Amino acid sequence: MKFGLWTQYGALNSKPIFAALEKGITSLGHTVDYNTDDCDIPVIWSVLWNGRMAPNEKIFKTARDQGKDVLVLEVGGLKRGTTWKVGLNGINREANFGPDGNGPERVQKLGLELQRWNTFGETIYICGQHDKSHQWRNMPPMSQWVLDTITTIRRTTSRKIIWRPHPRCQLSGIEHEFQNVIRQQPNKIKNTYDDFDFDTDDAWCVINWSSNPATQALIEGVPVFTGPESLAWPVANKDLSTISLPFRPDRTQWLNDLAYTEWTIEEISEGLPLKHLTF
C-alpha cells in the first residue's frame, strides 16, 4: 500500500511526526511518497482548513469523494508535546482510531489518571473552538452558537458563566449581552491548537462542541456537555436542560479507548498506530 505524505501543508511542528510515520509505514512493508495524489492513502496534518494547512481541505475532500481513506495527524491533548493523534478521516469521534473495548495498558503506559468527580464547582465554562476546522462544518457561526448556548443555560440556572474563545478564533463583546457572564482570554499553548490551560477546581461543568477541552475536563473530573462528534460523547451529557444535575458516569472504559487515539513519536515510528488501525 502506498501512503502519500503531504508534508508541505503540515504545521511547523509536524516534521518529526511525519518522519516517524514514514519509518512506521516502511517497517510494515508499505511504501511512501511525498506531496502527491498518486497514492492509496493520503496523509495530512490536521483538519484545520486555515493558514498553511488550508490546501489540505481539497486533498481531504477529493480523496473521500474517490472512496479513499485519509490518515490525519494532529497535536494530541493527553500529553501535550508527547502524544499525537493518528486517525482515519478525522481527529474526533467521526474518525476511525481502531477497535474499542481496549484494556488499560496504554492508560498505564501514558500515566493517565482519572480524577474524582468534582461536585463542588460553581462555574460553567463554555469553550469555543476554531470555526475554520472541519470539526465545525454544518454548525452555525460561532457567535450564534455561544449566544444560543448561554440563552439555553439561563432558562435553567443563573450560575456564573465563563466564556473562553479559542485562542485563534476570537469573538468580541458576546459576554456583555448577559448578566454574570465574563470572558476569560486563553493564552495559546505552544505547539497546540487548544485552549485548555485553566484550573478546573471551580468548574461545575464544561461545554465544548468537539475539541480537546471536553476530554481534558472529563479526565479532571468535570462533567461535560458536547456534540455527538466529540471524543467525550460516550460519557458526556447530551442535553443542557440537565445542567443543574449533570450526569457523572463511570469513565474507565472511555479512557482506555481514548488512550488509543494518541501515540508517542517512538510508537509512531514503530508502526503501532497503523497496526491498531489494522494496516
Can you name each region flagged by the protein language model?
Residues 1-46, 50, 133, 275-279:
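N-terminal pre-catalytic "stem/leader" segment of glycosyltransferase-like enzymes
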Residues 34-64, 205-209:
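Short, well-ordered secondary-structure micro-motifs within conserved domains or adaptor modules
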Residues 14-21, 52-58, 140-152:
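Well-ordered, non-membrane alpha-helical segments in soluble/globular domains
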Residues 115-171, 264-266, 270:
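Active-site donor-nucleotide binding/catalytic segment of nucleotide-sugar enzymes
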Residues 3, 83-122, 234-279:
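Leloir-type glycosyltransferase catalytic cores
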Residues 223-226:
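Short hydrophobic beta-strand element within catalytic cores of glycosyltransferases
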